[in-house]
């Protein structure tokens, strides 16, 4: 368990293929200056660079539309009202070592993680000739890859990424994995999380001559590795990560190694598994392991670096151990119900949250329904505890897709009706309890209430399977500015009046922590309390047009000096 495992800051544990282990000698410490990069070839552009295969062994293929294609209908042109109601997932990462079908397995695993990002997808493999080969593209995994593209990605190890932008604009150049050539060879990286000191690091690197090709915070990591003087290779990664603040679960690939890293607080999940042929697999969730028939072994521990090569799996402490602060919203909303996250079943957590709601906030009703899909398991728990039947009162159109995790906000009026259709026979004349996972701005909840009343519901009682969200997240989750969060501005009674329900109740924060028991101190609750484990140096602010800024490069920010005030 991540919450109970500690590491020595000076020792390295090596796991051999036969599962025996021994301890390495203590590793030397290295200075960490910001050096001027001599000759870097980071993230070569397909338009301006020499043939990628000639740059430090990096081969790059970008699946972007040709100039002649009609690009007017991209995935980013569509958005609806449900977007305002959900904290949007960050990203998903996959790493595979030791399987001749690495690219195809990576492709399948990314399918399993598609719910974590729909803007773009990419895979990097290492060919038999030790060349890093990349295919990235905008859109869903199935839109970016096909059989012919996977044929261009041979090799026995690979990393993959599905993207939702929390830092950096939505464009092809920001789609990961990123690949860079530097003086010691080539490296690819896929990152889930968000770096709160990104702007500071980027400014320091640019002042010393670094040239950036993207607006993503992940590129900072590659520059830090490139300028590091530490040896051997994994120490360069440790050297770079010790300068980072915030959330990061990352997988790296080089010509002969696969590396997995998780930040010392363990904000975002990262798990390790193994296939029957011995191939090692890393993924953001266990659902990805299940799909490719890899057996779950354990989490990558907070603050751990795992290096996989021909000699086995080596574990190294990243930096002194902190008390883990794992994102509680992985259990409330982000992860799939069939995943095991932070050592707990997501399904069981959500079911218990629903049971708690039924116990703490009962109401006379005839039927329990869910806002699909994320509210279903909690609604089942509520129904089971209350003894009231669960029925499918809202039907979700899955053909629309999870468009709320796409940042464009051009279509807002038809979102709820486009995605959710009421079942009049379930609702008409009934007192209805509606279970949802969260309320962010409140706009979608009000429209759902109105939709149910129009379908004949006699009463509508909203039950929310999480505490009120009162503060923005800076650790890899796209949330609005605090001034746009309805629970930060209004009381529960005022929110109930705003959305038009007959009653409204949230999961109690104290009861949530009580349910987590001895592990309660291992979770991050910043979105519920405003108490940040790693203080953000910039605060999200509402843009004049009504949009919020969550990009670490574009837009204006207000500095905060003396802690967080909500």
UniProtKB/Swiss-Prot annotation:
HAMAP family: PurF
InterPro entries in the cross-refs: GATase_2_dom, Ntn_hydrolases_N, PRibTrfase_dom, PRTase-like, PurF, PurF_N
Summary of the function given for this chain in its UniProt record: Catalyzes the first committed step of 'de novo' purine biosynthesis from glutamine. Involved in plastid biogenesis and cell division.
Protein name from the UniProt record: Amidophosphoribosyltransferase 1, chloroplastic
UniProt: [4Fe-4S] cluster binding residues: 327, 473, 524, 527
Pathway: Purine metabolism; IMP biosynthesis via de novo pathway; N(1)-(5-phospho-D-ribosyl)glycinamide from 5-phospho-alpha-D-ribose 1-diphosphate: step 1/2
Transit pept. (range): 1-58
Family to which the UniProt record says this protein belongs: In the C-terminal section; belongs to the purine/pyrimidine phosphoribosyltransferase family.
Pfam families with a match to the protein in the record: GATase_7, Pribosyltran
Gene name as annotated: ASE1
Stretch list, region Disordered: 1-28, 58-87
Bias kind Polar residues: ranges: 15-25
Compartment(s) of residence: Plastid, Chloroplast stroma
Active-site residues per Swiss-Prot or TrEMBL entry: 91
Tissue expression per record: Expressed in flowers and roots. Also present in leaves, and, to a lower extent, in cotyledons.
UniProt main location, coarse: plastid
């Amino acid at each position: 368990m991540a919450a109970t495992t500690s590491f020595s800051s000076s020792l390295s544990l090596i796991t051999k293929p036969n599962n025996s282990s021994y301890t390495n000698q203590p590793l030397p410490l290295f200075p960490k200056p910001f050096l001027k990069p001599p000759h870097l070839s980071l993230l070569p552009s397909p338009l301006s660079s020499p043939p990628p295969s000639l740059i430090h062994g990096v081969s790059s293929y970008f699946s972007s539309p040709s100039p002649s294609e009609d690009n007017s209908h991209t995935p980013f042109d569509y958005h609806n009202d449900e977007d305002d109601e959900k904290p949007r997932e960050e990203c998903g990462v996959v790493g595979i070592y030791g399987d001749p079908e690495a690219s195809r397995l990576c492709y399948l695993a990314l399918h399993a993680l598609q719910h974590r990002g729909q803007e773009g997808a990419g895979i990097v493999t290492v060919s038999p000739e030790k060349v890093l080969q990349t295919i990235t593209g905008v859109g869903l995994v199935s839109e970016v890859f096909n059989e012919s593209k996977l044929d261009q990605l041979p090799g026995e190890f690979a990393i993959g990424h599905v993207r939702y932008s929390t830092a950096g604009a939505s464009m092809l150049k920001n789609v990961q994995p990123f690949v860079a050539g530097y003086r010691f060879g080539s490296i690819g990286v896929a990152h889930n999380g968000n770096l709160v000191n990104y702007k500071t690091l980027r400014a320091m690197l640019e002042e010393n001559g670094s040239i950036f090709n993207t607006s993503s915070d992940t590129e900072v990591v590659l520059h830090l590795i490139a300028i590091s003087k530490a040896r051997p290779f994994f120490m360069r990664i440790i050297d770079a990560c010790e300068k980072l603040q915030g959330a990061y679960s990352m997988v790296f690939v080089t010509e002969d190694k696969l590396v997995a890293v998780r930040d010392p607080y363990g904000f975002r999940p990262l798990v390790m598994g193994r296939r029957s042929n011995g191939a090692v697999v890393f993924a953001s969730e266990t659902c990805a392991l299940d799909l490719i028939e890899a057996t779950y072994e354990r989490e990558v521990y907070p603050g751990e670096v795992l290096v996989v090569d021909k000699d086995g799996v080596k574990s190294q402490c990243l930096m002194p151990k902190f008390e883990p602060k794992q994102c509680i919203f992985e259990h409330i909303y982000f992860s799939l119900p069939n995943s095991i996250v932070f050592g707990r079943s997501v399904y069981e957590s959500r079911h218990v949250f629903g049971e708690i709601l039924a116990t703490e906030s009962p109401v006379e009703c005839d039927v329990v329904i869910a806002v699909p899909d994320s509210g279903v398991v909690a609604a089942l728990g509520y129904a089971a505890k209350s003894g009231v039947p669960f029925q499918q009162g809202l039907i979700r159109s899955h053909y629309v897709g999870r468009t709320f995790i796409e940042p464009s906000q051009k279509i807002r009026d038809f979102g709820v009706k486009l995605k959710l259709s009421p079942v009049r026979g379930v609702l008409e004349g009934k007192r209805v309890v509606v279970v949802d996972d969260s309320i962010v701005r409140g706009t979608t909840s009000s429209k759902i209430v109105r939709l149910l009343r129009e379908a004949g519901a006699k009463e509508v009682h909203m039950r929310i399977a999480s505490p009120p969200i009162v503060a923005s997240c800076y650790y890899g989750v796209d949330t609005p500015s605090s001034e746009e969060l309805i629970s930060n501005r209004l009381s529960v009674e005022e929110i109930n009046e705003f959305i038009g329900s007959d009653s409204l109740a949230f999961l109690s924060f104290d009861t949530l922590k009580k349910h987590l028991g001895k592990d309660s101190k291992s979770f991050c609750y910043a979105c519920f309390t405003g108490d940040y484990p790693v203080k953000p140096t910039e605060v999200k602010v509402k843009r004049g047009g009504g949009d919020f800024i969550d990009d670490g490069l574009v837009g204006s920010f207000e500095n905060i000096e003396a802690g967080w005030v909500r």
